Amino acid sequence: MAQGNNYGQTSNGVADESPNMLVYRKMEDVIARMQDEKNGIPIRTVKSFLSKIPSVFSGSDIVQWLIKNLTIEDPVEALHLGTLMAAHGYFFPISDHVLTLKDDGTFYRFQTPYFWPSNCWEPENTDYAVYLCKRTMQNKARLELADYEAESLARLQRAFARKWEFIFMQAEAQAKVDKKRDKIERKILDSQERAFWDVHRPVPGCVNTTEVDIKKSSRMRNPHKTRKSVYGLQNDIRSHSPTHTPTPETKPPTEDELHQQIKYWQIQLDRHRLKMSKVADSLLSYTEQYVEYDPFLVPPDPSNPWLSDDTTFWELEASKEPSQQRVKRWGFGMDEALKDPVGREQFLKFLESEFSSENLRFWLAVEDLKRRPIREVPSRVQEIWQEFLAPGAPSAINLDSKSYDKTTQNVKEPGRYTFEDAQEHIYKLMKSDSYPRFIRSSAYQELLQAKRKGKTLTSKRLTSLVQSY
């Protein structure tokens, strides 16, 4: 891989302003000490069957060096620190795409400074396409594409279909240059290039350490980035990014703006906030309330007829009678009763028995209006107005003056949300008055008790049937 004359250099001073640069510098100081000839990690060439593995060291060597030279007492801490450095690509396993450190005999190799993250690499997809394409031209077992790399290559080939010929030519030229290198040098450079892309295009499921925290990025003195091509590709084949203009100088806020800021922060201070303990208690109570309705946690009653021989579920559906769990759920809140068709029907029957069903019928009519085709909306708005809100309406509802005036204005330009304010007002009235009366009513209690009795009778019949056999 051609490294050119900018070996280990940064572009346009971006490196000094990168939010991660402090971390990079600390890691590179440790790497420099690791590579010291006298006190560093011993690098050796290992003889394998019919081949040699040059310039490697083991994972246990790294852990022992960190414990000895960085005054680390816990081996787990040393392993964690080494894994972080490996994830940033400063050293890498020679036979694995996952950049992690293992405290064993796994072989590792140092990355060349040209590929260090402190050089502020931001490689393009075209660079990655050249690299993958070049790998397919080299008939080496160690250079075969992994599954995720093959998928990436196919995706890039579709994305850059018009300029794929040029990308192929670039890859072919790079492959010819690599063939002219010494065998050992080529093996080392291939592994270092692979490790570079494992950092910038990591294995699915691995963390991308090159991503910049948005909070850190906002504190940069110069927020614009300069993209840098790995292979020196020309602008005509690179993806065009928007030109970043210098940030304009900020002006001191005016008196009006300061007043607006003060008003905003006063509103924020007056906002109602819940303590985390209250939120946790609320979440726990919600979970305990709905746990029996989660089939992953509690077996459903009645059981799924497709998984068992019990046909009770089908019998209940055929009889149109709700199960005990279904009836019990209506008591959790008015939303539960309204979103269940049978619950709405029972709620409406109860209100009709008390001659106060107009509120619920209005609420249901507005819900139906929201789902109507747009051509039917104006006529349906007039029907709802004449039935519930017009002077002398047959089913007049009780609205406050503010909601009525706003609805009157909305009717002049009918739409799906003409009655939004009126519906919200009626919903609050039902939630505070009609719904509690329905839950306390004998109709709901009888329905709930009937389900329990039915369940008891069914269990008794099953018991007697089993005993008879």
UniProtKB/Swiss-Prot annotation:
Keyword tags: Cell membrane, Cytoplasm, GTPase activation, Lipoprotein, Membrane, Palmitate, Phosphoprotein, Signal transduction inhibitor, Ubl conjugation
Domain G protein gamma: 255-316
Annotated RGS domain residues: 333-448
Residues covered by region (Disordered): 236-255
CDD domains in the cross-refs: DEP_RGS7-like, GGL, RGS_RGS7
Domain DEP: 37-112
Identification of the protein by name: Regulator of G-protein signaling 7
